[in-house]
Amino acid sequence: MHSTKVTYPEPMQLSGILDQYESFQVTPCIGTEFPKANLAEWLHSPNADALLRDLAITIAQRGVVFFRAQTDLDGELQKELTHRLGVQSGKPAGHRLSKHPLHLIRKDDPEMGVLDPGRQQKLHGVENTQKRQRAVLEYHSDGSYEVCPPDFTMLRMTEIPPTGGDTLWASGYELYDRLSTPYQKFFESLTAQHEVPSLRKLAETEPGIYDGPRGAPANTDMQFKQSHPMVRTHPVTGWKTLFAGGLHCRRVNDVTDFESEQLLSKIISLVGDNHDLQVRFRWNNPGDVAIWDNRCVLHCPTQDHYGLGGRMGYRTMGIAEKPYLDPNSPSRQEALAAAAK
């Protein structure tokens, strides 16, 4: 018998074209901000492809990138930018933007999500009246219930309260690096189930729900449930990242219920116990933008702004590859150490 050798993408390298723009690392391991850049100008630039290629690589390496007061952006430009980031960083042909399954019922743009607290409450059930004691449990990766989950999410805020409503991100690269070697190898051997039961329930009760492809031909499952490797390799960086834990990751496969609870609790405790692998972003201006890579970060809203003012934003998500693990890929810290030699 002849075995077929599996080949994986080569990591992409920065060209340096973004060095001309002021930027700073918000924390050492996650988050970069371009305080004065204009994304609309980048999109319309003659070298837009080169700019977006390096922006995509930067997001993949840093997890999340921030821009301030992008008032020249509208919904169509936001959709174009999100899609082109994926194209310039090698997403599969035929993969476009995610389509929300409720867009027909809401009569919305299928590729543009509206962040509205009232809508979220209606989708996910009645408001929880218990005291909030573990907000860390709201960390999640967007669309992880899909066969091919999202790559880049772009969130553009148009209305912000005077205080509150910050968003946090946690680095999946650093979560993996914080594990001991035996735990790393153990997690690499496992898969976990991601699902959103509230969407599945709506699919069973709402005749008008969209049942076509959600940004990729493979994304048609109306159970909104999918299993993925708990450790995946990022195709752009080539680094291993923990791809588990959080709101939508419901169960570790092939272990007992008790063991699954222990493993998922360990991951979420790593997030909550280590603020130095997180970054927190304050939305200061209408038009502030965050673009993050769901393949290597979890993110979490801060639900402290209710009654303090309106909060409205628009979200787009590109669709990436089916998650995979290259067992020979390095961790982020291993790759950075090798590059420094």
Curated annotation (Swiss-Prot):
Cofactor(s) in the UniProt record: Fe(2+)
CC per GO annotation: cytoplasm
Manner of cofactor binding, per the entry note: Binds 1 Fe(2+) ion per subunit.
Domain of life per record: Eukaryota
Stored InterPro entries: AtsK-like (IPR051323), TauD-like_sf (IPR042098), TauD/TfdA-like (IPR003819)
One GO molecular-function entry: metal ion binding
Residues annotated to bind 2-oxoglutarate: T167, R311, R315
Pathway: Secondary metabolite biosynthesis
Enzyme class: oxidoreductase
Binding site for substrate: H100, R315
E.C. number: 1.14.11.-
Binding site for Fe cation: H140, D142, H299
Keywords recorded for this protein, A-Z: Dioxygenase, Iron, Metal-binding, Oxidoreductase
UniProt-listed Pfam families: TauD
Role played: Alpha-ketoglutarate-dependent dioxygenase; part of the gene cluster that mediates the biosynthesis of oryzines, natural products with an unusual maleidride backbone. The two subunits of the fungal fatty acid synthase oryfasA and oryfasB probably form octenoic acid. This fatty acid is most likely activated by the acyl-CoA ligase oryP to give octenyl-CoA before the citrate synthase-like protein oryE catalyzes condensation with oxaloacetate to form tricarboxylic acid.
Family label: Belongs to the TfdA dioxygenase family.
The protein, known as: Alpha-ketoglutarate-dependent dioxygenase oryG
